[in-house]
Amino acid sequence: MTVFPTLGLLFLCQLLATTSAQRVGPQGPPGPRGPPGPSGKDGIDGEPGPSGLPGPPGPKGAPGKPGAAGEAGLPGLPGVDGLTGTDGPPGPNGPPGDRGALGPAGPPGPAGKGLPGPPGPPGPSGLPGGNGFRGPPGPSGLPGFPGPPGPPGPPGLAGIIPEGGGDLQCPALCPPGPPGPPGMPGFKGHTGHKGGPGEIGKEGEKGSPGPPGPPGIPGSVGLQGPRGLRGLPGPMGPAGDRGDIGFRGPPGIPGPPGRAGDQGNKGPQGFRGPKGDTGRPGPKGNPGARGLIGEPGIPGKDGRDGAPGLDGEKGDAARMGVPGEKGPNGLPGLPGRAGIKGSKGEPGSPGEMGEAGPSGEPGIPGDVGIPGDRGLPGPRGATGPVGLPGPIGAPGVRGFQGPKGSSGEPGLPGPTGIRGESGDRGPAGVIGAKGSQGIAGADGLPGDKGELGPFGPPGQKGEPGKRGELGPKGAQGPNGTAGAPGIPGHPGPMGHQGEQGVPGITGKPGPPGKEASEQHIRELCGEMINDQIAQLAANLRKPLSPGMTGRPGPAGPPGPPGATGSVGHPGARGPPGYRGPTGELGDPGPRGDTGEKGDKGPAGQGIDGPDGDQGPQGLPGVPGISKNGRDGAQGEPGLPGDPGTPGAVGAQGTPGICDTSACMGAVGASTSKKS
């Protein structure tokens, strides 16, 4: 236990001894300022000191302006199709849409009739129609073959002869009489005249619809009709069942940076850190005052190049410069590299079910599906109500070709035809008589310049001509190429101190400092105390060994100014200067002698002159011979015509002839039905 107090006492004594030995005396008065010495070499950069404790957070800066919207990112890949959800309950039927336009007729169905449907139930009897008007007598038919002998009929009653007429009339009712002897088979009576068409009876009540017949053979798929008008939006259906969770989509575009957070609470004041290393040397001092100009000396001869001098000794360390004011804000840094893709996050909780969206527009009707297999016949359904009138049927079969129509009126003259190709060259015609002299044509364009002829012999010198007028100033020539860079000049005087820059953007708040504790103090000062104890122990073991190099002392006073040097040797030749601007054009020189006339050049190629005036109108042409054109192709079948109106009532026909045998046959048939 007594070792630690003694070591601590020795450590304190050593610290006091070292500090007292390195004390600096009082600073003397400043001496006169000497000429600036040669600039020393840059010292070796010291190692960066440990980062200091984070300072207190600054005040909260003003919110920044929102950044401009970034460019649109690349479109994401299409997502994987989700699983098909369960079908929702069918919605209520919407109101019937408007009737669409009639589509084109479909291709004919396969040959053959469909399977016959089962017979429907008999409909209710219609109301008896009114008696029709008797039509005109028809043409007499051919006599028929004699029929087989019929069974003996009952004896008939005595006929009634009406007054004023010789025609026999059938009684309203023929009651059966006692059986008579079998009579001879009679001959077939004369066929009566064909009666006229009776009056159209009233339309009977529509019978109850029969059961639906079996489905026929499915026809081929018809052409798709035009798209119908958009129907009224149906009522909103109930919300469907929730689908399965889809696959995770690609990551979206990163959003804009969030706003700066609120200023945090001020952290506890940190401990004072250890003293840092010596900083870098300060900026170079201002140049000294300019000396007096010496008398010009006699230029001496160029001396030989001297041997390179030895490197000078390292100068004293420069004093610490005054800390400069805060400079302007630096340029924005380069954009950082894209970060590593983050790990896949946990699947988010399923969101709440959203409200059902509005019904979408009705889709384009799809193609007719493949006909399915014939199903089993279902039970007979109840008789349904009378349906709405069906759509207009398909157009009828194409009619026969009608007779050839009369020739139509001559058509309008057609458009001018395309100019035909040039025909083969015809035989040479007979040379015609010489025509009258035409009007002189327009002057042709000047021909191309002929080739330069050979130079003639030099002629006699002519008289000197008069001095010509000063020509216009020529265009300024292009700038010459840039010369080699010159020798750098002397450094100029240091500029004035700049104005204080705009306060910079408040930095992000640093992490909160650690709380003051014994462990924290040991972490900061433990290594330094261990080094001091190790050095103290080494000095105690070797008291005669030289100690550590002390800190450099303060700079001494400047020395006296040196003598003025002699005139130096002339420097090396400088680089060539920049090319000057092009000078103005000089006065034109005297006119030269006229040369001899050259040889005649080759004939120039003429250029087609402009088109001449339009000639007089020619004689009328020979009238052409017209021919009937070919019959046009058969037109497409027309639309079905409107149903015709009922015709007028025909004239009343002549009274018919009643055959008693026919009446008897009718009575016999009625009795057989009753039995």
Swiss-Prot record:
Q: What does this protein do?
A: Collagen type IX is a minor cartilage non-fibrillar collagen. It is associated with type II collagen fibrils.
Ranges of biased composition (kind: Pro residues): 27-38, 51-60, 105-125, 136-155, 173-184
Location, primary (coarse class): secreted
Residues carrying covalently attached carbohydrate according to the record = N479
Q: Which residues form a coiled coil?
A: none
Task: Specify the domain of life of the species encoding this protein.
Answer: Eukaryota
In its keyword annotation, does this UniProt entry include Glycoprotein?
Answer: yes
The annotated region (Nonhelical region 1 (NC1)) lies at 659-675
For this record, an example GO cellular component is: collagen type IX trimer
According to the record's subunit comment, the protein's assembly and interactions are: Trimers composed of three different chains: alpha 1(IX), alpha 2(IX), and alpha 3(IX).
Instruction: Name the family the entry cites.
Output: Belongs to the fibril-associated collagens with interrupted helices (FACIT) family.
Return the annotated region ranges for Triple-helical region 3 (COL3): 25-515
* Region Triple-helical region 2 (COL2): start-end pairs: 547-626
Name the segments for region: Triple-helical region 1 (COL1).
632-658
Gene Ontology MF terms: extracellular matrix structural constituent conferring tensile strength
Modification note: Prolines at the third position of the tripeptide repeating unit (G-X-Y) are hydroxylated in some or all of the chains.
Family annotation (PANTHER family): COLLAGEN TYPE XIII ALPHA 1 CHAIN, SI:CH211-266K2.1
Instruction: State the protein's name.
Output: Collagen alpha-3(IX) chain
Q: Where is this motif: Cell attachment site?
A: 242-244, 591-593
